[in-house]
Structures are given as C-alpha cells and as structure tokens.
C-alpha cells in the first residue's frame, strides 16, 4: 500500500459512550476493537488514534470529492454537533480528514484506501463510489453512536490508527424489495437505501409489478394505478399504493447520491394480474371472467397474451415511460413462474408459435423475452430475468438471476452468460424463517439463519474456472407476502442483509463468522440510531433430546418438569420467575430450570448494548390428569355442521342458523375443498366438527393445529382465530387420562393476510411432553 503518513504514533484511544448528561466515560464494549462490516480486504492496525473535534476540517480534492465531503460533514454534524468546515485542497494537512479520487489507484472500480494516524486521515477512492465507501468505513471506525440523527454526548470521537486497502469481491451486491405484496412509502424506501449504503450494498432490486398490484404510474395507461394498484383483501378492506413518476425520480436520485443503483422490475409475461385487471384485453381471453387484482398469494394462470401484437405495443409503451426513470445499466423483466395453460388454449398464441416456427409454449416464452430484450437494447439496457428465461432458449445478452437453486446459474455461466446468484437454498430468500416458527411471525416457509446467509459463496464448484467471471454477484430477496408492516420488513431484512453484504464484498479467505458476530454487536447499535426493528434471536425450547426447536408457551405437567432454552446464535438469555419483566440485569440463564409448581417464567435475549428481544412468557401449569369419559358405542369420525356465509373468523358465525349436518373421518376433511390457486374458487364457509379423541396413555400432551379453534374437554384450548395461521403458533399442552376426551374443531374458509385457509393442512398433531416427535391424530382416534 502507498504510505500516506510517515508516522503512526501514540496510544490507541477508543470511543467512550455517554448517553446522557453529565457526560459519562464508561467504555462501551460494543465500541471496542475494529468493527467494520463488511470486513476489508486488507487492514493493519497502527498505534494511536485521530481525535475528531469541532475544528477538524474535511479537505477535498476536486468537485466530486467535495460533494462527498459535504455529505459526510452534514451527517457527522447531526450526531457530534460539530459544524466541520469543508474546503477544497490539493493536498493533505495535519489535523484534517482529506478526501480525493485517484483513477490510477491499483484497485477495482469501487476500491479505496484509508489511512489514519494521530496526525490526520486520508481517504482515497478510485472513483466516487470508492471514496464514498471509504468514508462509510471511516464512520464505522467511529463509535456506533455516530449514526444518531441527533446530538450525542460522547467523551471522545476517536478514529483508531489503521491502514486499509479495500475493494469488493463482486460488482453486484444486491437486495430485493417487493412493494407489490406490501407497499413501502417513499420514506420507507429512503431509509432502506440509507441502511444498504452503510454496508456497501450497491444494487436495490425494486419489484414494481405483480399479480397483487401495479405500483408505478404509467401516464399512457392510467388504469394501471387507478385499478391495478388496489386489491380487496379477505376482510373486505382495500389495500393499495403506487409511486408517481416524480416520486420514482426522487427515490432514484436519493439512491444515486448514496451510490446505490436501482434495478427496476416490470414482470412479464406472467405475474401480470395487476395489468390484466386494468386492461383485460392484454390476456388471451378478455371475456372469460371478471379480472381482479389478486388478493391471495401464489401465481395466476392468466398471463399476457403472447399472440397479440397489441400486447407487445403495451410492453413497449410501458418501457418507453419506465426506462428513462432509471439510469442504471440493468432492467429486470421477471420471466418467472409463467403458466402456459392459457397459451395452449389460445388461437392467437398457437398461431404465433406456428408463424415463428417455435417448438412449443416454452419457446414462445423465450420469444417474448427476446422481443423485450430488443426493446431494452434501444436504450442501452441489459436485460435481467429469473432463471426460467432459460426455458426455450436464452436471449443472447440476457443476465440470469438464479433463484431455483444454483442449477440455472451454473448452466447460464457455463454458456457464457452473466449471472447473479440468489438461491433460496443458499439462504438468500430472507423472507424465510430465521428462528422457531412456533414463536416467530408467520413466514412463507423454510429456514434461513444468519450464518447460512453469511456462509453463502456465489461461485459454485460446478462452474468451469474460465467461466467463473460471469458470476457478477449475489442478492438477498425480501419477498413481502407476509411482511404486513414496515417494522416486520425490517425484522426480516436485518441483520441478514448485513450478512449478505460481507458475503459478497469480503474475500473468501477473510470471512470469519465468529468475528462477524462480534462486529454485529456494534452494527446493532448503529441500527438502533436509525430506529430499525431488527431481529434478535429469541429464547427457544428444543424438543427433548434434540437441537430442533418446538417452543411452547403453555406447559401442563403433573409432577415436575424443566425448562431448557437455546438461541439460534450465541447470545445471553435472562429470565424472571416472579412475574416481573426481565431486564438486562435479570438472572442469566446458564442451565435448565427445574419446575415443580405452577408459575410464569419470562425470558428474553439481551445484546451487549443492553437491548432486549421480545419477552416470552411461558406458563407452567401443574395439573391433575383430566378424566376421560366412557363411550358405550363409539362411531368412527366427527359429526359436522357447515354454514355458508361471509365469515372471516370463528366469532363471525356465532348466530348462524343455516347449518348443514354431516360426518367426516378425519380433521383433514374439515377443509371441504382444496383451492387450486385461483382466487375465484374461494368459498366463505364455516365447518364445525365435534366428537371425541382417544388418548392412548396417561400423560401431559402437546397439541398443534392450524385449524381456527380446538376445544378440549369443553374448553377453548387452541385459538388461531383471525390469524394467518399457516404455521401453528399456539401449541398448548394438557394433562390427560387415557381414554376418550370431548373435542370440537372449527375451520373457517377465508383469506387472511393473503393466505387462503383452503391451503391449510388441517391435521391435528400431538406428542407427549417428554417426546421429541409429533404424531398425527388419525381416524382411529376420533369418534362421536
């Protein structure tokens, strides 16, 4: 590395925390050491530190460096209170922070050097982006409170002496936000961009059109927003939102100022119901049904008609308005999950296949993609599509975004096409669970831990060595089906997006997950300054003799039991047994707790900053065995009654009188119909099944179900009413004698949170408290 300073002297002085007047000088543990994320390519720590004071000038060489200097001076003023002078200068000066751009720097496009000593700091970027990232690194050398939007009383604002040479491993470091399933405001978008740029993520993939909503103004087609941006939810309420073109420009500029390039996505030829509901003539059969913006998740069978030339004129018109709003090189056209059933029926599509000499509907999709590619080429844009664009042949210059595992990315790279890796199997679908589904907010499925995201390597061994340069990077996808609020979106995104940032920036040999966990403690405090609702691992209960969690908030026992806790990564657990709320100073959990009486144990995880996770209250109820009843002549199954009506939850049919009686063999049959992914098939009804369940032996039993309600021995036992009950989060236990026990089960056919209950598996599962495995309640266990 070039030497920017001759001497690095004096003793290292770290930041001290003072959160309130009078100023404290207590050393904050999370501010100890070097806490840069992502870990730089090369870092050498020197002796001493540079003290940032109100008199520290920011000197900049050249106009671009001056703009960046002003940006960071304003940011530093908010937390330090210092009005740091910003001046143009052709050379460094003692006591200053000097910024410059040097295109001859022997680093990649976004590379930078940073050197600090007690005499001063110099940050050199090969480009403006490199200089910006160097200054983000400088902020991470300061105490975490530097991210505060308001004045913080600190004993010292010190920058440790370091020599850093850094550049990213990959050029594409991305994060996807889905504003179609659930909308993000302009301010939400700006905050997310701020957070991405802090950790050197340089691409924001903006998913703007979907079956569930069209979110961008198109002046030539006003119904796309007056109709296509709105849907009627399962509870009858309207949900909507869209961005005007002026708002798009505002967000794009905001991102550009922070060196984040926005990649827009306009979905075609599938995922198009937002457009089709607005203009039905875009589909193969405009008069077959009443088209509405989809209010359930999943994929619509109706897609853009590939046989009509008017469809391509619509696509051209949309691109003519959208492309100029986004100056980046990439434009995403989707291309995924496009059902071919309508094309097979459509005479226009079949004529297109014949006229163009195409083999089948897969090649018809490829035809659509190639035409979109040519439209984008007029603007000098590179087309990106999901890996389904490989079907039927790949457009010549297309970049593949590989999401269905790595197979598509491997195939495309070995063919010589550029690839962006984003496989769910690699942990990069960060809308997936990151903890026990029994206690975490509902998610679509699956399990993506922080360590799994961090450990992902975007270059699979199956790519031949001379084709590996085609892997341009990786992206974390934040699909929003179950992200009902902005805080919930943040909870899914962070800290996993931070793990992705290091996975795609830091050289493979420099990655160290344990050290990343240490540095993350500092990053958490930075997120706190931005009021981010990030995920803190919750205390979970493992199944007996297992590491698999199946947490339980109501534990019935007859003699004694125990409470064993674990977290998805090392973090201190605190608890109380007197009913009080835990604090950072509460008793630390070190070993299983012995429980011999009825009580409530409250548990939480606590970070080094003192911040607590959500508190879990676990009720322990010492019970006598609930007696069984005698059935003289049990008849297999459950008696049912069914009522059709505008029902949303169990409370809605309390006064219903239009019941039809029947019998079912299992609880699975309480769901009378199976929805085949079409919102028009949804039937609003309630089904109640009553009878008895046979318990095989005395003991405490845990029950789990996604049904709306389960009554046991005449009492409401499990209540999922009104929830998106995709994965049971209300498991409960009861001490039961062997034999028959009265039960009632309630199923309500409705759409809640975009999830139709007709997609539920309405089985009931049970296990003994001491067992590690659930079993399904079978027909042999039910009678009336």
Residue positions per predicted region:
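Short, compositionally stereotyped local motifs that mark structural "simplifiers"
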Residues: 20-24, 59, 511, 517-642, ...
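Feature activates predominantly on carbohydrate-active enzymes
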Residues: 105-330, 371, 375, 475-479
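Active-site neighborhood of glycoside hydrolase catalytic domains
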Residues: 295, 299-397, 403-411
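Flexible, acidic glycine-rich loops studded with aromatic residues
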Residues: 383-388, 393-398, 404-553, 558
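Coil residues (strongly favoring Ser/Thr
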Residues: 7, 64, 79, 376, ...
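Bacterial Sec-dependent N-terminal signal peptides
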Residues: 1-29
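Contiguous, structured surface segment used for ligand recognition
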Residues: 21-170, 488, 504-526, 530
